[in-house]
């Protein structure tokens, strides 16, 4: 994968989660070197140079403080040290790797004025799997994700801590064990490394990749539930989708038609007197589809951000009146576009769990389940079956409702009022990641519950798609013949979802799904 060229969210996921190798493209090296020459020209002028933010001035509310030439390098080092104020749990390796990729991508676009040596060290961290220790909390999302990115930059200068080969080590030790050496920051480089949206974008991009997959998982889970509840596939008729042409709705309906074709269960009740199913079954295209569309829009926003320059000041070559370089101070570090997109994505993803939990209620409630045993227990009363599995899903759904409060509507002024509006996008990203985890668990509960319902419909066979999903579930979760702790089953089903094995098994039976 070449940094400095357009990256997709799928590309980012491949590098962050699956270790796909990266390299810096030749054009990126040329761009970075050219922008660095502009910074070197300012630094070479020494105290005679004009005041340029972040090169020979202080930061934030101290931007009017002029820094002497002999302190230029110390200024950058002090910036990184002072801004490393993160708190809370440590980020996982995939999230840290995504941050490294995105920070390198910004530099590779050639508007940051950072030396290629820094770019190479970032790429080497990925190659050697050196993972800086980055606390998850401490950013307000403008001027970018300062605190988490400062922890990343600490490792580059041999300070802070990093993980290497499973051990948490002083960064200098981790670098040495990996055959790397720390760098000394030159003019502007500390600022260029910490000023940007790479924390919120990294977490958000990975969460959106998960959200997109969960849209398909929700369709699969809903199809299994529909078979267990002896529901109808008629509401998914393509003609209905054509007269309300939302793409996500059409995508979900197409999945459901593919998943439900050729079902003995469905054929057995084709002439039943029931006119309509509950909304949680009948309206899956409209609800799941709306989530698909919202997640797709958020992914478009994040894809633009992945390939954007969020540095400040920004170096432009050949734009000055004399044909030379020009540095422009602006606000590209502000995370509002990302924050709004991730807040919407959290609300959209939460709906997958909202409607899933209602289907679980249909499955366990004998008044709604069309002949299934109460709580799907083998001997209801002596055994409680899936009674508390539904309660667990309800808990996750309610937690998501709290997490869906938008962080992006909040702002707290900082830096003595100079930074008087912030995005809180880092909180949006962390909330989305937790919502996604909760949705995955909710869908896992639906899958194991619905699979039990399908068992009770034997000897009638479900559709090929539902049979494939059922078989995949049964490979990791046996049927319930008597009460047992279900937490291991829920975790196993959640892993089946997260690994992609469920979707793969179903697609093998019915072909590619949306």
Curated annotation (Swiss-Prot):
PROSITE patterns membership: PAL_HISTIDASE
Annotated GO CC locations: cytoplasm
InterPro entries linked to this entry: Aromatic_Lyase, Fumarase/histidase_N, HutH, L-Aspartase-like, Phe/His_NH3-lyase_AS
Family matches, as NCBIfam families: hutH, PRK09367.1
One Gene Ontology term from the biological process aspect of the record: L-histidine catabolic process to glutamate and formate
PTM comment: Contains an active site 4-methylidene-imidazol-5-one (MIO), which is formed autocatalytically by cyclization and dehydration of residues Ala-Ser-Gly.
EC id: 4.3.1.3
EC top class, as a word: lyase
Chain's gene name: hutH
Cross-link position per record: 5-imidazolinone (Ala-Gly): 142-144
UniProt-recorded Gene Ontology molecular function terms: histidine ammonia-lyase activity
Pfam families linked: Lyase_aromatic (PF00221)
Protein name per the record: Histidine ammonia-lyase
Family membership: Belongs to the PAL/histidase family.
Pathway, per record: Amino-acid degradation; L-histidine degradation into L-glutamate; N-formimidoyl-L-glutamate from L-histidine: step 1/3
Alphabetized UniProt keyword annotations: Cytoplasm, Histidine metabolism, Lyase
Taxon lineage: Bacteria, Pseudomonadati, Myxococcota, Polyangia, Polyangiales
Origin superkingdom: Bacteria
Localization per Swiss-Prot or TrEMBL: Cytoplasm
Gene3D superfamilies membership: Fumarase/aspartase (Central domain), Fumarase/aspartase (N-terminal domain)
SUPFAM superfamilies cross-referenced by the UniProt entry: L-aspartase-like (SSF48557)
Catalyzed reactions: L-histidine = trans-urocanate + NH4(+)
Organism annotation: Sorangium cellulosum (strain So ce56)
2,3-didehydroalanine (Ser): residues carrying this PTM: 143
């Amino acid at each position: 994968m070449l940094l400095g060229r357009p990256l997709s969210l799928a590309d980012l996921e491949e590098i962050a989660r699956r270790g796909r190798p990266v390299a810096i493209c030749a054009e990126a090296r040329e761009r970075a070197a050219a922008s660095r020459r502009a910074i070197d020209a300012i630094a070479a002028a020494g105290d005679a140079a004009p005041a340029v933010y972040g090169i020979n001035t202080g930061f934030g509310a101290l931007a009017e403080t002029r820094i002497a030439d002999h302190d230029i390098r110390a200024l950058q080092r002090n910036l990184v040290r002072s801004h490393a104020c993160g708190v809370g749990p440590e980020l996982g390796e995939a999230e840290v790797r995504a941050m490294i990729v995105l920070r390198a991508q910004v530099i590779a676009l050639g508007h940051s004025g950072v030396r290629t040596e820094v770019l190479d060290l970032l790429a080497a961290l990925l190659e050697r799997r050196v993972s800086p220790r980055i606390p998850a909390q401490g950013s307000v999302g403008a001027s970018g994700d300062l605190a988490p990115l400062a922890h990343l930059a600490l490792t580059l200068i041999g300070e802070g801590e990093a993980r290497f080969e499973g051990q948490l080590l002083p960064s200098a030790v981790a670098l040495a064990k990996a055959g790397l050496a720390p760098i000394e920051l030159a003019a502007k480089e500390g600022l260029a490394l910490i000023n940007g949206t790479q924390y919120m974008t990294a977490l958000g991009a990975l969460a959106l990749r998960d959200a997109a997959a969960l849209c398909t998982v929700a369709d699969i889970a809903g199809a299994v539930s529909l078979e267990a509840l002896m529901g109808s596939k008629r509401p998914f008729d393509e003609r209905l989708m054509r007269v309300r042409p939302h793409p996500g709705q059409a995508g979900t309906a197409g999945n459901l038609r593919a998943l439900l074709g050729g079902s003995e269960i469905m054929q057995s009740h084709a002439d039943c007197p029931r006119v309509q199913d509950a909304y949680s079954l009948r309206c899956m295209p409209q609800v799941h589809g709306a989530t698909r569309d919202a997640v797709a829009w958020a992914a478009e926003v994040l894809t633009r951000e992945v390939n954007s320059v969020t540095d400040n000041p920004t170096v432009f070559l050949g734009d000055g009146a004399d044909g030379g370089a020009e540095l422009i101070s602006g606000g590209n570090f502000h995370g509002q576009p990302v924050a709004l997109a991730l807040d919407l994505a959290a609300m959209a993803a939460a709906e997958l769990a909202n409607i899933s939990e209602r289907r679980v209620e249909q499955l366990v409630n004998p008044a709604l389940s069309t002949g299934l045993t109460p709580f799907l227990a083998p001997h209801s009363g002596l055994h409680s079956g899936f009674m508390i599995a539904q309660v667990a899903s309800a808990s996750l759904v309610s937690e998501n409702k709290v997490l869906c409060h938008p962080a992006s509507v909040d702002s707290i002024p900082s830096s003595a009022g100079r930074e008087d509006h912030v995005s809180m996008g880092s909180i949006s990203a962390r909330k989305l990641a937790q919502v996604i985890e909760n949705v995955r668990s909710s869908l896992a509960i639906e899958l194991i519950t619905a699979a039990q319902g399908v068992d009770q419909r034997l000897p009638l066979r479900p559709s090929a798609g539902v049979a494939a999903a059922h078989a995949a579930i049964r490979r990791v979760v046996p049927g319930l013949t008597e009460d047992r702790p279900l937490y291991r089953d829920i975790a196993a089903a959640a892993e089946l979802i997260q690994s992609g094995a469920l979707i793969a098994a179903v697609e093998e039976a019915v072909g590619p799904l949306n």
